[in-house]
């Protein structure tokens, strides 16, 4: 709870104090949320990521997680979108085991997609151990989902590489392997981008992306990873992996013409990962670049619905 001196009242927040929880039991609040969604949908956005969706509703005497009433709200949002904006998408962010996340698809009447969090660290584990078991084991634990729903699979995103869904022993192994520099560790994860995690080893970057693009589900690429962008470990919290996209060698990496001091975060300028060395414009003109390799892999994937939509059989 945090005191608001303007309202002269306390308010509840599950996470940061600048993220107050809304009272979805109040119909006026839900209508205000619908109004905000309509604004962005009318602007042309393709969908919404429902952040930390398991904690939407609060009830006294509970952990306020995965409550039945949360699913009621999601169904209402889905119905409103389907009726007025067909073809738009709801993506659930629920950092839980696959069998628990399954509930957020409903009967094809809640979220269209959901992140598969436990798969992500196990791809890194498989590469480090040169063993397929971490991947095959979690895929065996992944339940069937409605025909028109899909898992969103990923290697990195705007947060830390979360190790919440592994054992303490596995977490220590991954920390020691990928984050020997303790500055890279945050919460229960690692605050590095893909290329630094792979120590700029192009073959390992390609191997991980090949795994991602051939898994059941829809691959979700984090901006900049397609060109091997680095991070800024000296920035606080998770900001090190949220630096401006590096489009060219122009000012601020082509991201903005503004005074660099006015940017929310500074562009990367070091010799290895800075925008003078790593950018879209340069790689677009190089047929052997990571960007063009990624484009070719995506083209191959799109040629067959077996990738992502096909069935998967484990070979012993």
PLM segments and residue spans:
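Active-site and adjacent substrate-binding regions of carbohydrate-active enzymes
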Residues: 1-316
């Amino acid at each position: 709870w945090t005191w608001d001196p303007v309202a002269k009242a306390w308010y509840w927040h599950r996470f940061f104090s600048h993220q107050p929880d809304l009272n979805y039991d109040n119909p006026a609040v839900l209508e205000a949320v619908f109004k905000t969604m309509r604004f962005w949908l009318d602007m042309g956005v393709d969908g919404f990521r429902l952040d930390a969706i398991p904690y939407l509703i609060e009830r006294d005497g509970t952990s306020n997680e995965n409550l039945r009433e949360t699913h009621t709200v999601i169904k209402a949002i889905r119905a409103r979108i389907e009726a007025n904006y067909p073809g738009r998408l709801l993506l659930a962010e629920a950092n839980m085991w696959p069998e628990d996340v399954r509930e957020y698809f409903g009967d094809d009447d809640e979220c269209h997609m959901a992140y598969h969090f436990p798969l992500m660290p196990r791809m890194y584990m498989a590469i480090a151990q040169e063993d397929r078991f971490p991947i095959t084991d979690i895929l065996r634990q992944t339940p069937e989902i409605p025909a028109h729903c899909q898992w969103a699979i990923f290697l990195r995103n705007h947060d830390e590489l979360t190790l919440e869904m592994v054992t303490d022993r596995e977490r220590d192994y991954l920390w020691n392997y990928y984050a020997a520099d303790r500055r890279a560790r945050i919460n229960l994860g690692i605050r590095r981008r893909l290329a630094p995690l792979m120590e700029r080893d192009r073959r390992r970057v390609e191997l991980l992306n090949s795994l991602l693009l051939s898994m059941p589900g829809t691959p979700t690429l984090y901006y900049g990873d397609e060109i091997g962008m680095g991070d800024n470990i000296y920035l606080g919290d998770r900001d090190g992996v949220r630096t401006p996209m590096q489009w060219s060698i122009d000012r601020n990496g082509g991201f903005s013409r503004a005074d660099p001091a006015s940017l929310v975060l500074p562009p990367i300028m070091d010799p290895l990962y800075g925008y003078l060395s790593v950018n879209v414009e340069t790689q677009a003109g190089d047929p052997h670049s990571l960007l063009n390799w990624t484009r070719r892999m995506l083209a191959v994937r799109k040629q067959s619905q077996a990738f992502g939509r096909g069935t998967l059989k484990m070979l012993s």
